[in-house]
UniProtKB/Swiss-Prot annotation:
Induction cue: Induced by the EvgS/EvgA two-component regulatory system. Negatively regulated by H-NS and the TorS/TorR two-component regulatory system.
Xref: NCBIfam families: PRK11566.1 (NF008599)
GO cellular component, one term: outer membrane-bounded periplasmic space
The entry's keywords: Acetylation, Chaperone, Periplasm, Signal
GO terms of molecular function: unfolded protein binding
Organism listed in the record: Escherichia coli (strain K12)
Biological process annotations from GO: cellular stress response to acidic pH; response to acidic pH
Pfam families in alphabetical order: HdeA (PF06411)
Origin superkingdom: Bacteria
Family that this chain belongs to: Belongs to the HdeB family.
Chain's gene name: hdeB
Signal peptide: 1-29
Name recorded for this polypeptide: Acid stress chaperone HdeB
Amino acid sequence: MNISSLRKAFIFMGAVAALSLVNAQSALAANESAKDMTCQEFIDLNPKAMTPVAWWMLHEETVYKGGDTVTLNETDLTQIPKVIEYCKKNPQKNLYTFKNQASNDLPN
């Protein structure tokens, strides 16, 4: 094996190792959920990502009395602005504190 081939092999192995580290980091980030997100992290999101995150948070494990459901459009128009306003006023709180507060305000 000459030096040129050895150099190419080291470069290839370095690239594979770097990609493996990036993928491992992405997998760790994917395991975190909105349950761990603070309001400040929510506000710092790209505005296009706020609606799906808030919608998922509001509807995760939500059971309505009588099996009632709410469409995405109705939720976006009524709850998403309230989540954003709440988080701007309470950046240090966990995002799920809004859901807990909202469930206490709504009749079951």
